[in-house]
Amino acid sequence: MHWRNSLQGYGALAKFLHWAIVVLIIAQYVIIEAAEELPDGPDKFAAIANHKSIGMLVLGLALVRIAWKLVNGGRPAPVPMPRVQRIAAAAGHGLLYLLILAQPLTGWLMSSTAGYPTGFFGWFEFPMIAAENHDAHEFYEEVHEALFAVLATVAVLHALAALYHHFVRKDETLRRMLPFVGPRRT
């Protein structure tokens, strides 16, 4: 498998970044839901710290993914589909990128406005990006939670669209992003 994208499929780096971000976002949800059930104490604070660290990792990977997309150029040839579906696919991908960036940024803002640092697995702390402010913290907390609901919805629609292409249209859309899978040989 090649690192770079080609007309036949996505390269190893694009696939790795895609699936790493997917797995980390799912882990984020599981960690924070579990943390909310814990009483205040070291376990809860450790879970929240891990949630923040993974969020910043997602932000970094998303920035690398976008940079790779811009630098790499070549991407798989588009699958023939009606214009409205092409527009919906492009809009959906753009929205996913936006949400994947906005989610950790609003989390970082939420943490900063609460006066809490955002660390990275205990190795270092990111700078505060906003002054401590209770009202701003409440606002960013609501935005962060609302954005996750939108992200989850768009991600499910994205997955359903890929499954539709695979099982109904029987095209290469899903196969070209699956790890360790290449296009069908014809």
Question: Could you say what each language-model-derived stretch is?
Answer:
Residues 1-186:
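Membrane-embedded alpha-helical bundles that constitute the cytochrome b-like, heme-associated redox core
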